[in-house]
Each structure stands twice: as C-alpha cells, then as structure tokens.
Amino acid sequence: MSLTISSDALTRKVAALFEKCGSTASEAQQVAANLVLANLSGHDSHGVGMAARYVDAVLEGNLQPDATVKIQTDHGMMLGLDGCNGYGQTVGVQAMELAFERVAQHGCCIFSLADAHHLGRIGHYAEMAVERGLISLHFVSVWSRALVAPFGGSDARFGTNPCCIGIPLGWGDNTREPFVLDFATSRVAQGKMRVAHNEGRLAEPGTLIDEHGHPTLNPGVVVVPQSNGKTGALLPFGEHKGFGMAVACELLAGALSGGGTWHHTHDGRRAVINNMLSIVIDPARLGHQAFFAQEALDFIDWMRQSPAAPGTEGMMLAGEPERLARAQRLRDGIVIDDASWKELQDCERKLGLAG
C-alpha cells in the first residue's frame, strides 16, 4: 500500500520535524526541500524516507542543527572544509558557494569537505554548478555502517561511495539541459534496497549477497539484521571496476579530507557522515569555450541518431530521467510507501507533533 501527496505538503510535513529538532525555519525548509526534490527526481532512496534517520541522529547528538561549514585550510583555489556534523544539505551548499567564489577568482576550485552529515543526492551539487555554466566532479565516502563488499570479498567493508560529474551543454542562447551523472559505486544505492524492502519487491540478480556471502534477491539483508544478527552486503557495480572506483572515493574523500576511512566496527549510531572531494571548473578559463560548447552539442546530437535498441525508447542522457520524473511527480504527486509514511508519523509522535 502507499499514499500520494503533493510536494508542497510533503515539504511542510518534513520541515516541521527538523524545526522541532532545533533547526531554524530556514534550515528546516532547505533540508526538507532537498529531500523532497530527491523524491521528485525519482530517487526515493535519497528522499523523505531518510527523515526519520535524521531525527534520530539529532536526538543522539550526532547531527548538529544550524551548523556552518568552517574553513580549515585556505590556499586560494584549494580549500579544506569542516562540515561540523551539520546537515549536509546546508553545509554542502555552503561549500559549493565558497567554491563558486574561488572559481570566479581563479577559474577553478578544489575543496575537501569532512564530517558533513548525509549530503543527500550528490547530483544536487552538480546541478548548482552547471546552472552557473561550470563543470563539477565529486567523490564521496560514507561513514555509517559498512554496506558494500569488495570485489572477491564476502562481507561489507565500506559504503556506497557515490561519484558525480556535472557538465553544462551549450553556451549563451544555445544552452541545453546539462549532463549530470550521479551514481553509487555499489550496483544500487542502499536506500533503493530500503524502498524495495518496504514495498515487498525483490532485488535484481547480482545486486546482493546475504550474511553468509551467498547471492540473494532479498533486499532485507541490507536493511534489517538477519537471524544471526549480521547483515548482508551490496555488490559493487561492474565488478572490479566499481570496486576500484569505491576505493578511490574512500581514499580521495575520506583520507584526503581528514574525515577518515572505513576500518572500524559500526557502533550503532543512526548518523550518516559523508566526506567529499570536489573539483569545480570554469570551462571558459581554458580558452576554448565556444569550441567546447559546440563540440559537446555536436557529440550529443550524433549519439541521439543511434536507432533505439529493441524493447527500449532509445538512449537517454544522464540527468534526463530525473527531469522527466520531476515533471510527472509535480503534476501527479509523490507516492510514499506505507513504511516510510509510518516512520514520519512515528517521528511526529516522538517529537510531540502528532495531532
């Protein structure tokens, strides 16, 4: 079962939770709107289903409302930032805004962000960049509980460690919708398994192993502890290739930022801590803006001439599925599964908001 709700009503409902937890009305609205935008974009895994976990993290003292990103090191075009365990949706945006200031001065900014609470959908930060005609690359590590097994391993050793690349397409009056590639280095995001578990759906073959290291289709193995108290694991996408990307994210985002890497036992906290290394570039500063813009469009047009494969509607560029989902869900509403809705209601009762 499920229910359908408008994005505005859902944002108000979730913002009330965060404001009750100590955020200003402005921050509560910003975080809630970011989560709802993930739902609108078709990524329910990163949407309001995370709200209950955020509330628990605040109540445990591991998520700090109204935190502000701090500059730890400053070398002009290079910044080392501390997220101070604040909402990723606010400190992540603050980090990007600092980067935009440095790009205006230097043409490029490289920054590390350590100890931010869950940054949400990383594509949001790439979208911020491409709206300004900038290119951005993001490497992220995840500190919560280990969820993904190394290629050739049989238990979870690290997080879903997403990567994201945003590239503007066109220039001036000939600007098109951008290329925004945002993906977990696991075959699927853990949140998608939470949604599948809540909805009673099976996972695709090759996605999961159980607590014994055997292949399984049961998404619950990475959502709830199994009979022996252990959990299963997600598998990396592309076998050794996705595994290699995940390791790169752990080293670039976790180690390089000062936030840390996975080599410890999870202590049961509900907080999800992200570290991120980001590179933001003004393509015009490389001296080939007009060529870059036209060449990018020519290449995209060339690809679109490929006939659709049997049983498909043809190629889609990264970012297009999200834009289509937003249009449809803004029109028809957002479908929330019963388990996620119950979690929101439980949070309201816990915080004294229930009517």
Language-model segments: residues:
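N-terminal nucleophile
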Residues: 155-158, 165-168, 184, 244-260, ...
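Active-site cofactor/substrate anionic-group-binding motifs, chiefly glycine-
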Residues: 46-100
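N-terminal glycine-rich anion-binding loops that anchor highly charged ligand groups
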Residues: 2-10, 23-49, 63-74, 270-273, ...
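Phosphate/diphosphate-binding glycine-rich loops and adjacent basic-rich segments that engage nucleotide
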Residues: 148-223
